[in-house]
C-alpha cells in the first residue's frame, strides 16, 4: 500500500497539486482511498490482538494533555463537515497510569464514529471527569443515535448493521478494539444512546499511578508516512480533507 501511495505521489507531486486545484481534487480521492485501506489494515491488525488479556505497559502521564492534544488536532477536520468539536475537563492537568498509544487509538475510534454519524450543524463533546478514584472519558454526539436493541451488541466483533453503518466501508471493529483497550487497562466501556438523540460512549479507567513516570523522548509515529489524524478519521471525512494543504 505504501508503494502505491508513493507512485501516486510521483504522478501528482505536492508542488503540482498546490497550483492545480483540479489535479488536487482528483488526487484527494485517491488519497482518501489509500487512507481508508490503511485504516482497515490497522484495525484488522489490532483485531488480531483481541484475544490478548495481558496488562498494557502503562506509564504515569498527563491524561488531560493527551486528550486535549488529540481534540485540538481534530477540530479543523471536524469543521470541514460543519460539526463542532468541544473538549471539557474537570482539571487542567491530571496524571495517571495509562498506555498512551492505546488511549489515543481508542479516542480516535470514538471520534471517527461520532463524526461519521453526526450531521452538519451537530456537535461532538469530549469530556474528562474524575470520580471516586475512576477516570471517566466520554465522547458524546448529537447524531442519529442507535436502536435500543442494538446496544448490547455494539462491542461484538464484526457487527455490521445497516442502521448503524450507512457508509459502505468498515468492518465494525472499532468498538471491540475500544473495549479491549479498556479491559487491558482494568477498565470498562459503556454505550448510551437513543434514536434521534445521539450517543455517548464512556471509558472508565482506574485513577491510579504506577510509579513509572513518562519519559519525554522525541515521539516517532511511523504510520507508513501517512498523517496519523487523517488516518484515524479517514472513514468519516469528505474528500476535501485529503487535499494537499491537509496532508502537509
Regions found by a protein language model. Name each.
Residues 76, 144-145:
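Glycine-rich G1-box
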Residues 114-115:
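Short helix-loop "hinge" at the ATP-lid/N-box region of the Bergerat-fold HATPase_c
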Residues 32-37:
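Short alpha-helical segment of the dimerization/phosphotransfer core of two-component systems
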Residues 186-187:
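Conserved glycine-rich
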Residues 146-158:
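Short conserved segment of the HATPase_c
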Residues 21-22, 51-61, 65-66, 97:
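Short flexible loop/turn segments at helix-to-beta-strand junctions
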Amino acid at each position: 500500500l505504501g508503494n502505491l501511495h508513493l507512485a501516486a505521489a510521483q504522478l501528482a507531486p505536492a508542488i503540482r497539486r498546490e497550483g492545480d486545484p483540479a489535479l488536487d481534487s482528483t488526487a484527494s480521492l485517491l488519497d482518501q482511498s489509500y487512507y481508508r485501506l490503511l485504516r482497515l489494515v490497522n484495525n484488522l491488525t489490532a483485531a488480531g490482538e483481541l484475544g490478548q488479556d495481558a496488562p498494557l505497559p502503562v506509564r504515569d502521564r498527563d491524561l488531560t494533555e493527551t486528550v486535549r492534544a488529540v481534540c485540538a488536532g481534530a477540530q479543523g477536520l471536524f469543521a470541514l463537515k460543519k460539526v463542532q468539536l468541544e473538549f471539557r475537563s474537570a482539571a487542567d492537568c491530571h496524571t495517571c497510569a495509562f498506555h498512551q498509544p492505546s488511549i489515543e487509538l481508542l479516542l480516535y475510534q470514538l471520534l471517527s464514529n461520532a463524526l461519521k454519524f453526526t450531521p452538519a450543524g451537530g456537535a461532538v463533546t469530549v469530556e474528562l471527569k474524575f470520580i471516586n478514584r475512576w477516570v471517566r472519558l466520554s465522547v458524546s454526539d448529537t447524531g442519529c443515535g442507535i436502536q435500543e436493541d442494538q446496544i448490547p451488541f455494539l462491542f461484538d466483533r464484526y457487527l455490521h448493521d445497516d442502521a448503524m453503518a450507512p457508509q459502505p466501508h468498515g468492518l465494525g471493529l472499532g468498538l471491540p478494539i475500544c473495549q479491549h483497550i479498556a479491559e487491558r487497562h482494568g477498565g470498562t466501556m459503556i454505550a448510551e444512546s437513543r434514536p434521534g438523540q445521539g450517543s455517548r460512549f464512556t471509558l472508565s479507567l482506574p485513577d491510579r499511578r504506577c510509579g513509572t513516570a513518562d519519559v519525554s523522548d522525541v515521539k516517532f509515529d511511523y504510520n507508513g508516512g501517512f498523517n496519523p489524524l487523517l488516518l484515524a478519521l479517514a472513514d468519516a471525512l469528505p474528500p476535501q480533507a485529503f487535499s494537499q494543504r491537509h496532508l502537509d
